[in-house]
Curated annotation (Swiss-Prot):
Key word Cell cycle present: yes
HAMAP family: MinC
Protein name, entry field: Probable septum site-determining protein MinC
Family as reported in the entry's similarity comment: Belongs to the MinC family.
Complex formation: Interacts with MinD and FtsZ.
Job of this protein: Cell division inhibitor that blocks the formation of polar Z ring septums. Rapidly oscillates between the poles of the cell to destabilize FtsZ filaments that have formed before they mature into polar Z rings. Prevents FtsZ polymerization.
PANTHER family in alphabetical order: SEPTUM SITE-DETERMINING PROTEIN MINC
Gene name of the record: minC
Pfam families: MinC_C, MinC_N
Taxonomic source organism: Aliivibrio fischeri (strain MJ11)
Any one of the GO BP annotations: cell morphogenesis
This protein's UniProt keywords: Cell cycle, Cell division, Septation
Length: 221
């Protein structure tokens, strides 16, 4: 029996660039700076642009090329009900995307046994625990990346990037003994190092998602 192409609906975690005002050039400059802090994380990553707070006319061709210059891939716009703007965005190659409140992705029933790594994670290395939690019994160096579909436990210093809930599980957590991260992410929501309050720097912490926002708590144990 010949197989045919099948079109199905699915859910993906996408980054959203929120334009805070009419200064699109400033927002693109900010995006470029953020990408420069973690280029491997953002490289070729799809991004949606929210233009809800932009009241002036937008040059969508320039907006698209500006995002592409950062190395990210602009796939669509959201926050726009103006039909004329939608037509201009479509002509520039953007998809029109409707905002919605996603249902929380629950932990998979077929989670695999926890992946345990005893050696240091060195710069340039990437460790991925597919459908599992990840335990690192050592340090994570700058430029290294640890990823898990579940939670991440680092029994050492986190100087690289930790990406938990990679498949969208918002209940995933990141634990580390000494927080000095380049980037932390849970279910597609991320903070770069300059977004982490200094009170948590060098601390034993738990990182969670609370009401769609990353939260950091210090641990005393």
């Amino acid at each position: 029996m010949t197989k045919t192409a099948d079109l199905k609906g699915s859910n993906f975690t996408l980054s959203v660039l929120h334009l805070p005002n009419d200064d699109v050039a400033l927002a693109l400059n900010m995006l470029e700076q953020k990408v420069a802090q973690a280029p491997s994380f953002f490289a070729s990553a799809p991004v949606v642009v929210n233009i809800e707070n932009v009241s002036n006319e937008i040059n969508f061709v320039e907006l698209k090329s500006g995002v592409e210059r950062t190395g990210m891939i602009p796939v669509g716009i959201t926050g726009c009900k103006d039909k004329e703007k939608q037509a201009q965005a479509t002509a520039a190659g953007f998809a029109i995307m409707t905002s919605f409140t996603p249902q929380q992705v629950t932990q998979k029933a077929n989670m695999q046994p926890t992946k345990v790594i005893k050696t240091p994670i060195r710069s340039g290395q990437q460790i991925y625990a597919k459908d599992a939690d990840l335990v690192i019994l050592n340090h994570v160096s700058p430029g290294a990346e640890v990823i898990a579909d579940g939670s991440i436990h680092i029994h050492g210093t986190l100087r690289g990037r930790a990406i938990a809930g990679a498949s969208g599980q918002a209940e995933a957590k990141v634990f580390c003994k000494n927080l000095q991260a380049e980037l932390i992410s849970i279910a597609g929501n991320y903070w770069l190092s300059d977004q982490i309050d200094k009170e948590y720097w060098h601390q034993n912490v738990m990182i969670t998602m609370v009401e769609d926002r990353i939260q950091i708590d210090t641990l005393t144990l």
